[in-house]
């Protein structure tokens, strides 16, 4: 059966973007259908029937799984497992840093930071395995399992997008042998499985939030839901859920988000339903889990239809991700995708390539829009490894051979001494390397060799305040000669995702250029964690409340998309100035957050016809009738026939038959356009009708003539 599905949404401020009157009831298959799972009592093992999008929304879930092992980092990969501590220095420097006081020799540097050159780092990973020494021959292991869930469209998305999220700290330390809540008798006696207890203990050692009562409860509920389900590598599926939640904890997510991260896959293939999660954990968690499921639905449709290869459609899909969901649901989906990318090896090469392509074109730019550079860098480098393995291996070797650790260590010591002499206090001075994928892109774009790129090696300095940033810049230029034209002031002129920092390139000791980045603690947290930055610091440590930060970040995502679209049309994003300075918007800013404002602007629609998806743009206030007219005469399926398309199609809006074709398309609506006649038989039926009509016409002409004569004669 031919099914056309449309998802309509506005690329406009997030004030009323989600209407609870337009809900989606969907139980759909997972993102990846290759990785097998063992059967369990709590999940169906039936295979989905291939037969159109209606089955996609209501049929059995496809079971998929993949290894959650994240303990196999690769040379040149920034997503390797890195041990995480809670110290301020590690938070500020992330995995980009190394300092003489901490890293005396190369062995520790390479052990603590998995990369081809010991410093090609991404932000802290969720991997719970101990740090391992770099090996040039190490391969990235991993599997992938993405599934989507059921129930409704995201409720209260604006309320949750701007609500308080800071409930991270807890003073209580809970022991899993004495849970402060009761569980059903059947589960109470079985929950002490060694692997589950060990997994929880490892998470608790890394992040205090896993000692929270609600997080422990979610852990054991997830264990019950996924019991018997295994990743393709043989690991329990529960490990993927915990690793996803640990990625969220790495960026400081609160207990609600971490709980939803643990449960993000439960709707699709376990006994859990939206109502079950609602009763057990409340609407906040239930709506987040459902929101992740809806985003997974879009992701699956995009991958099946190769949307990532279509630049304009991919860009619109970015906007849909941002506009459809609670911002925290987007973060959970990104964490889910990041861990699956970290464990991708279980997929066959063809699916691995397609999965990496979608991640590079959809999810990495999405992380960039959210301002989470740490996840963006990780995603890009993993995609680079799987899409271009030969280039990745070659460049990793080149970086490792060219890296001068002694020079970086000497530069750090020299800068620290100069700062102390000038009386400039600082938090961290660390060494860093440009990401492997960024180097690759720069080489292609500017047709340069690796030796001609000036910002591969670098230092990062975190100071107390903005004034000290400029003082420290003067110190840097006194120590080393400045490379002309390489100074960039992103403090006075922030990037569109809120990024602020001073960048300069100097000639370090010898002939190797050295990029130096100077920023405050607040700027660094914003750069690393974007929207989630307010989770990492207390209200008193930043200029603006978390409410304002969330509100402005949401609006900024739309601004970023707007200017990126302009850039693709020929304008330079670097030459345009932001409409408003962070964190407030001008009164006339079209992208400002207006809770009571009306939706304006185009409606972006996903149209699925013959199980093929395109992303199209409709004017505001478009109706189902407008969509039918576009899908009718302009469609190749209907062009040879004269009967109007609306007579051929039976639209369903959010699983409900449409009685009023004047119904307006709104944010997140899903419209199925099903032919009244099965598509397979449609052509045959209409050809037969045409033949019958022609035969009847031929016989009726002489008959009508005779009848006319008789009537005339009778009169």
From Swiss-Prot:
It is an enzyme of class 2 (transferase). GO terms for molecular function: ATP binding; GTP binding; GTP diphosphokinase activity; kinase activity. Belongs to the RelA/SpoT family. GO terms for cellular component: chloroplast. Keywords: ATP-binding, Chloroplast, GTP-binding, Kinase, Nucleotide-binding, Plastid, Stress response, Transferase, Transit peptide. Possesses ppGpp (guanosine 3'-diphosphate 5'-diphosphate) synthetase activity in vitro and is able to functionally complement E.coli relA mutants. May be involved in a rapid plant ppGpp-mediated response to pathogens and other stresses. Residues 65-84 are annotated as: Disordered. It is found in: Plastid, Chloroplast. This is Probable GTP diphosphokinase RSH3, chloroplastic. Residues 1-64 form a transit peptide. Its EC number is 2.7.6.5. InterPro entries: HD/PDEase_dom, HD_domain, NT_sf, RelA_SpoT. It comes from Arabidopsis thaliana. The lineage of its organism: Eukaryota, Viridiplantae, Streptophyta, Embryophyta, Tracheophyta.
